[in-house]
Amino acid sequence: MDSKYVIKYYDCFLEDGKLNIVMQYAPNGTLHSRLHAQRGKALPEDKVWQFFIQALLGLRHVHSKKIIHRDVKSLNLFFDQDDNVLVGDLGIAKVLSPNTMFARTIVGTPYYLSPELCEDKPYNEKSDVWALGVVLYEMCTGGKHPFDAQNEGALIRKIMKGVYAPLPGGKFSSQLSDVLRACL
């Protein structure tokens, strides 16, 4: 895919029964590792906006090709040498046919599953935007998930209720809180 915000894939091959993917080098790691390095502290709001918008632009490009990513998470958002976000790991992405508007297979990482996926309903690119909302929350809380539980069943119930702790008071703009609410 030819986008400044989608990681480039060059090749893949099997070796010893394992799939190896050759992709663009991302020298500045992943958003997940960056959040871990923050040691529980939120990113500054200007960085949150930058990374969120760049990830959104990458997803817009993916969606324009009728592809649903299906595994949007901080571990799959990489940084290039200029600290631009690159949407990566489209290994479980779903290409929709021209006549198809929704996918049905449940895949992805539990913390990032949209309510539609939790309810085993058809879903579309809005599920990717929902997962990006989870990433947005992580950036604002130093890596915390908006929906957390001791087991998958309890996690799914929390996701379906849609109730999460508000962002730290006074730390982020009302616009950012509004965008988060629109995503989740």
Predicted regions located by residue number:
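A conserved loop-to-beta-strand element in the N-lobe of protein kinase catalytic cores
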Residues: 7, 16-24, 32-33
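Protein kinase catalytic-loop region centered on the HRD/HxD motif
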Residues: 57-67
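Conserved catalytic-loop aspartate of Hanks-type protein kinases
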Residues: 128
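AlphaC helix of the protein kinase catalytic domain
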Residues: 32-43
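Activation-segment/catalytic-loop signature of the eukaryotic protein kinase fold
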Residues: 12
